């Protein structure tokens, strides 16, 4: 139904509201957090080995907000491997989470890697052209060498692929094993100055930008 006059009543539990094609969040219990996942934390809700998991950061946030219903549960959106740190979302917005993880909506992700050895000029070109891995070809959209020397280099890489450990495998394939890796951007979102272990709720503008990215 298209509404052209103010004052029309809607039920946010059964109706979806859109403005200029973008979904408008009307449920205050829909929460999406940005987490700076520390290295060593497992991206899972429960770990049989007893290692720290990202689920604890969601529980901590909810514990700090007793006004929210006890039934709320924040789930990780996608994953980062255990030794990778950086930007990870925790959310109870099922539709947004589903689209962010769906292969047809692969959004750009930017990582900063500290690698072994000095990166030669051919390496970024090779990564952009594509590398054949055991599960198919992988290529970067953009590669920037931030610093390079015999003792190690800093490489920023942006790509759309969501394959497991893809950045580590690509850099290893060109002779530069990763010693530290952090995701700094996810689509329109930037990690900014969020410190490891910290969380913050996404702003309305950030939610709207994510929705636009995945066609909501």
Question: What residue ranges belong to the model's regions?
Answer:
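Basic, flexible Lys/Arg- and Gly-enriched helix-loop patches that mediate nucleic-acid binding at interfaces
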Residues: 1-216
């Amino acid at each position: 139904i298209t509404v052209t006059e103010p004052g029309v009543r809607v039920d946010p539990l059964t109706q979806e509201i859109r403005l200029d094609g973008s979904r408008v969040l009307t449920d205050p219990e829909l929460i999406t957090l940005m987490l700076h996942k520390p290295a060593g934390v497992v991206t899972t809700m429960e770990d049989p080995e007893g290692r720290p998991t990202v689920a604890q950061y969601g529980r901590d946030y909810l514990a700090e907000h007793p006004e929210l219903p006890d039934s709320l549960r924040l789930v990780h959106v996608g994953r980062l491997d255990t030794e990778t740190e950086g930007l990870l979302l925790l959310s109870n917005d099922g539709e947004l989470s589903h689209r962010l993880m769906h292969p047809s909506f692969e959004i750009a992700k930017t990582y900063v890697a500290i690698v072994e050895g000095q990166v030669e000029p051919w390496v970024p070109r090779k990564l952009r052209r594509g590398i054949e891995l055991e599960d198919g070809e992988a290529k970067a959209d953009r590669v920037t060498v931030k610093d390079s020397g015999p003792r190690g280099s800093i490489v920023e890489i942006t790509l759309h692929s969501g394959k497991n450990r893809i950045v580590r495998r690509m850099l290893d394939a060109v002779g530069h094993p990763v010693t530290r890796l952090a995701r700094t951007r996810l689509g329109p979102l930037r990690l900014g100055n969020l410190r490891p272990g910290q969380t913050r709720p996404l702003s309305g503008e950030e939610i709207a930008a994510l929705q636009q990215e995945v066609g909501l």
